[in-house]
Amino acid sequence: SYVLAKSLNPETQVRALALTSLMDMRGGHVVFCAPEALAADVAMCETMQYRVGLSCAAYGGYTDAKLPGMRATREKLIRSLGLGLYSTIGSFSGALDQGKVFSPTQMILDQELHGFLARYATKQVVNEDALAIDEIVSIGWRPGGYLASEHTLRHMRDVWRSNVYGRTPWVSLEDEQGK
């Protein structure tokens, strides 16, 4: 399709998407979440970008997991973190079983993961306000000083918060019911 697009109009912008897999020789089935497949995606993106001059992204949203949950999320995280170093992080679609199944539950988990990765990939601001060295020196070791400072009040919501996973510590059922 690259040759066709360029032959029809040399100014046509063309992009590539890397999504490689390998065959598990024990069962003869395709595997997307293997280190070798990730390495092939990275190699494909680098070849397209640096040898061909073609913009290339790698898709991290495929999983070999059949059910929604932690395995699927872990596989997507592993693919995305590795590929995110070389490519853009695309959105996820709730796909399971190598894209053959859609799961609304997995889509919610995927959106959580995407929010986390987008925040992780955000360029961190490093300036006098962010470092707050003068404030740290002026507060020193006073008890409770940082929690009551203006700087903390201005920046306390600058952190990513999950809409699905809680940040509270584990509480036993008895303690939870006792409240």
Residue positions per predicted region:
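Catalytic-core signal marking the mid-to-C-terminal active-site face
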Residues: 105-179
